[in-house]
UniProtKB/Swiss-Prot annotation:
GO terms for MF: DNA binding
Record's protein name: B3 domain-containing protein Os06g0194400
GO cellular component: nucleus
Localisation: Nucleus
Gene3D superfamilies: DNA-binding pseudobarrel domain
Region of interest (Disordered), residue spans: 1-23, 38-82
Coiled-coil zones: none
Keyword Transcription regulation: yes
InterPro entries to which the protein is assigned, alphabetical: B3_DNA-bd, DNA-bd_pseudobarrel_sf, REM16-like
CDD domains in the record: B3_DNA
Assigned keywords, A-Z: DNA-binding, Nucleus, Transcription, Transcription regulation
PANTHER family (UniProt xref): B3 DOMAIN-CONTAINING PROTEIN OS06G0194400, B3 DOMAIN-CONTAINING PROTEIN OS11G0197600-RELATED
DNA-binding region range list: 139-230
Amino acid sequence: MIEAESQMAEAASYEEQRRRQVEANKRKLEELRLHHLSAAVRESASKPSPVKQRKRKARALPGAGEDAPLRRSGRVANLPEKPKYRDEFQDFEKRIRRSYGGKRRDLSNRVYATDEQRDYAINAAQELEEELGSDYPIFVKPMLQSHVTGGFWLSLPTHFSRKYLPKRDETIRLVDEEDDEFDTLYLANKRGLSGGWRGFSIAHKLVDGDCLVFQLIQRTKFKVYIIRASSYYETDD
């Protein structure tokens, strides 16, 4: 019986020791878990959140920026605004067309010069050119149908335009022999007169075969002399 009691006591001691070992293992496991959890928390706190890295774009308030000036660098902002030559001259050409009316000349009444009339007008214009002298740049321009009917476009001599006339589109004033003035639009790239030339042509009843002498009396002003092709017949009387 004593032996049985001794065995029971040993068994109880073994169970107690085993229980204590299990509890000790549990405590170590819990400590280990807490350690890893703490490390994970520290690591996650040290890394910036992807959501935080993204910069939130400020939302513009309704109506904001409508009256605000365009932001530019100081160097660009201080530069003068470029003049809008094309817009200005388009408006100018419209005004010229309105002032002289929009109707085309009746092409059924076209006048066709004979070779004799044409030669006479050119020779008379060249004589006048010599009389006027070389104090001002000057050239002679015989009139064709395209100059005085239909298109009303007057091309100017290339060499003269390159040497004396503006390098960009500009208003050129024509002064006739009565000192009446007519504004025309000079197109630098095409080297000719556009808007306003039609009005000058109609006002002076220019026809095919007439010959004009252009004398540049100012940078953008021509004195214009007209030799009529019809004068050929007057010389025969």
